[in-house]
Amino acid sequence: MPIIIDKDLPARKVLQEENIFVMTKERAETQDIRALKIAILNLMPTKQETEAQLLRLIGNTPLQLDVHLLHMESHLSRNVAQEHLTSFYKTFRDIENEKFDGLIITGAPVETLSFEEVDYWEELKRIMEYSKTNVTSTLHICWGAQAGLYHHYGVQKYPLKEKMFGVFEHEVREQHVKLLQGFDELFFAPHSRHTEVRESDIREVKELTLLANSEEAGVHLVIGQEGRQVFALGHSEYSCDTLKQEYERDRDKGLNIDVPKNYFKHDNPNEKPLVRWRSHGNLLFSNWLNYYVYQETPYVL
């Protein structure tokens, strides 16, 4: 089934070229089907790239989704045209009186700051509080997951000596959890972060369950409130070349950046990346949408 997006959204052309089923709002409104309302709070500076990554995954399900893109009103985005935000994005103030079936809170390149130092932290806290009573299930990604764990449960983040950067093997820690339906015992996911949350802190919170972690990369998947809150510390949504672009960007800036681990063939940046996370990335998002959004949400929000 399709995702419903604005007919002029630039990501639409990319998705159609990849045979991702998209539908315009005009076409959807002629169908007698209630689409799931999904909000994406896009905190990334590379907004259009992140749009395509997430829409690619949530569009690969049998569900019809009405997608609403959100940006932070209290933060000035310097890497995206204001025209793009005006045309395709809303703010929390625009939607705070609505209810949503699902919400995705993305990562953000602010993890070396304390949460309180982030210029939009107060606005983000209001959105996370709103999600507890107005959203059926919220999926938090990377820094968004760290922010959610801190705000809702007081779980701290800690600086790493070196950036966690690459594609890492993870192990399923809980069996018979719907979010992991169809997962192999071992699976891969990308990570790109300078901070971590610790397994010991997660296990001290009785409302949280650790679902998957990595010996090298640490905590990856955590669930809370019986699935109303999902936290993914990795980046299962990443495209095949995202880590490559991050590596080349930092290298060209003269930063001391290592080659992402387990990513390029033979760990040689002149070789093509090896994509080993795509199937489980699709599975993660489809399981979240099916079991924690579609199966749990009321017909009338």
Curated annotation (Swiss-Prot):
Pathways involved: Amino-acid biosynthesis; L-methionine biosynthesis via de novo pathway; O-acetyl-L-homoserine from L-homoserine: step 1/1
Catalytic activity from the UniProt record: L-homoserine + acetyl-CoA = O-acetyl-L-homoserine + CoA
Active-site residues from the entry: 142, 235, 237
Organism expressing this protein natively: Bacillus cereus (strain ATCC 10987 / NRS 248)
Effect of residue 163 to M: 13-fold increase in Km for homoserine
Enzyme class: transferase
Site (Important for acyl-CoA specificity): 111
Gene3D superfamilies from the UniProt entry: 3.40.50.880
Protein name, UniProt field: Homoserine O-acetyltransferase
